[in-house]
C-alpha cells in the first residue's frame, strides 16, 4: 500500500469525496484502523484525557506526543499521521520549530496547532522549514480556561472572525484545517471558502472530512459524552465492524446527522 499524502485529501476535496479520520494513540489500534482502511490518523493531545486521565489537555507534553507518535507510526506505517503540538509548545515560531522537529522525527507527517491569525508567522516559519501544518479553529481545547469550558464557538459576529482566521492560516501555508464545535452554517462557509481540506468534529456533515476521538467512536468515553459523538460499536458489534461503519457513514454523509450538529 502506498503512503497516504496530503495530495490525496486535496483530491478528495476537489472530487467532493468525504473522508474519515480518527485519533490513535498506540500500535494496536493504529494497526486496526489501518487494516480497515482509515488512512489519516491524529495523535491528539486528547490523550491527556483519554489515556492519562486528566480533566483537560493542558498537562500533555511534547515528549508524550512523541512517544505515542512513534507507537502509532509503527502500527500504521503508510498512514498520513498528524500530531498535535501541545499547550505552550508553540508560543513563539522558534519554539514551534524546535518542538515540531521532535514530533516529525518521531514519525509525524504534519503538526496540528490551535489558534487563529496570531499563528500566521508560526505557520509561515514551519512551512518554510518543510513542516506541514494543520490548523485548528472553533473550540480549541487548549483554550478551555479562556472559553470558560467546552462550548460551541463561532456564533454571531464571531463567525466572521473565525472565517477570517481560516483564510489567514491558509494564506500562511496551512494545508489542512480542523473545525471543532461550530454551527453547520459556518462550517459550510469555511469549507467552501478554503481551497485546503477541512476536517470537522462537531461541525456537521458539510466539511470535507470528519474526525472522532476513538474512545467516542467506541462508546468508551468516561464522563460527559459530546453531542457530536456516536457509539458505532453499539450497532456494529465488534471494533473492526464499527470502524467500517464509521467510515461508510462519513463517506455517505449519514454521519454526522442533525442530532450531532449545532446551529
Curated annotation (Swiss-Prot):
Binding residues for 3-methyl-2-oxobutanoate: 45-46, 84, 112
Q: Which GO terms describe its molecular function?
A: 3-methyl-2-oxobutanoate hydroxymethyltransferase activity; magnesium ion binding
Q: According to its UniProt record, which cofactors does this protein need?
A: Mg(2+)
A Gene Ontology biological process noted in the UniProt record is: pantothenate biosynthetic process
Pfam family name, one: Pantoate_transf
Q: Which pathway features in its UniProt record? A: Cofactor biosynthesis; (R)-pantothenate biosynthesis; (R)-pantoate from 3-methyl-2-oxobutanoate: step 1/2
The residues the record assigns to binding Mg(2+) are 45, 84, 114
Cite the cofactor comment.
Binds 1 Mg(2+) ion per subunit.
Q: Does this entry carry the keyword Metal-binding?
A: yes
The reaction(s) annotated as catalysed by this protein in its Swiss-Prot or TrEMBL entry are: 3-methyl-2-oxobutanoate + (6R)-5,10-methylene-5,6,7,8-tetrahydrofolate + H2O = 2-dehydropantoate + (6S)-5,6,7,8-tetrahydrofolate
Please state where this protein is localized. Cytoplasm
Active site at which residues?
A: 180 (proton acceptor)
* CC terms in the record's Gene Ontology section: cytoplasm
EC code: 2.1.2.11
Q: Which UniProt keywords apply?
A: Cytoplasm, Magnesium, Metal-binding, Pantothenate biosynthesis, Transferase
Q: What is its main location?
A: cytoplasm
Function as written in the Swiss-Prot or TrEMBL entry: Catalyzes the reversible reaction in which hydroxymethyl group from 5,10-methylenetetrahydrofolate is transferred onto alpha-ketoisovalerate to form ketopantoate.
Which proteins does it associate with, and in what oligomeric form?
A: Homodecamer; pentamer of dimers.
Which PANTHER family does the record cross-reference, listed alphabetically? 3-METHYL-2-OXOBUTANOATE HYDROXYMETHYLTRANSFERASE
Q: What protein family does this chain belong to?
A: Belongs to the PanB family.
> What is the protein named?
3-methyl-2-oxobutanoate hydroxymethyltransferase
Which lineage? Answer: Bacteria, Pseudomonadati, Pseudomonadota, Gammaproteobacteria, Enterobacterales
Amino acid at each position: 500500500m502506498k503512503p497516504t499524502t496530503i495530495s490525496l485529501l486535496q483530491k478528495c476535496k476537489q472530487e467532493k469525496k468525504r473522508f474519515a479520520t480518527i485519533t490513535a494513540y498506540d500500535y494496536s489500534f493504529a494497526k486496526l484502523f489501518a487494516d480497515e482502511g482509515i488512512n489519516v490518523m491524529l495523535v491528539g493531545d486528547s490523550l491527556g484525557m483519554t489515556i492519562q486521565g486528566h480533566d483537560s489537555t493542558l498537562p500533555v507534553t511534547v515528549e508524550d506526543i512523541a512517544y505515542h507518535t512513534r507507537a502509532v507510526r509503527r502500527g500504521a506505517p503508510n498512514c498520513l499521521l498528524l500530531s498535535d503540538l501541545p499547550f505552550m509548545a508553540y508560543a513563539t515560531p522558534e519554539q514551534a520549530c524546535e518542538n515540531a522537529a521532535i514530533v516529525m522525527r518521531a514519525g509525524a507527517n504534519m503538526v496540528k496547532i490551535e489558534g487563529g491569525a496570531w499563528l500566521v508567522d508560526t505557520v509561515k516559519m514551519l512551512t518554510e522549514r518543510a513542516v506541514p501544518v494543520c490548523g485548528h479553529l472553533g473550540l480549541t481545547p487548549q483554550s478551555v480556561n479562556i472559553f470558560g469550558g467546552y462550548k460551541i464557538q463561532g456564533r454571531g459576529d464571531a463567525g466572521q472572525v473565525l472565517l477570517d482566521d481560516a483564510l489567514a492560516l491558509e494564506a500562511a501555508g496551512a494545508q489542512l484545517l480542523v473545525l471543532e464545535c461550530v454551527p453547520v452554517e459556518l462550517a459550510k462557509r469555511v469549507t467552501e471558502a478554503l481551497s485546503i481540506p477541512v476536517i470537522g468534529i462537531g461541525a456537521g456533515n458539510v466539511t470535507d472530512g470528519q474526525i472522532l476521538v476513538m474512545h467516542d467512536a467506541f462508546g468508551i468515553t468516561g464522563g460527559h459524552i459530546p453531542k457530536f459523538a456516536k457509539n458505532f460499536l453499539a450497532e456494529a458489534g465488534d471494533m473492526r465492524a464499527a470502524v467500517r461503519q464509521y467510515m461508510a457513514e462519513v463517506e455517505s454523509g449519514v454521519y454526522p446527522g442533525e442530532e450531532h450538529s449545532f446551529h
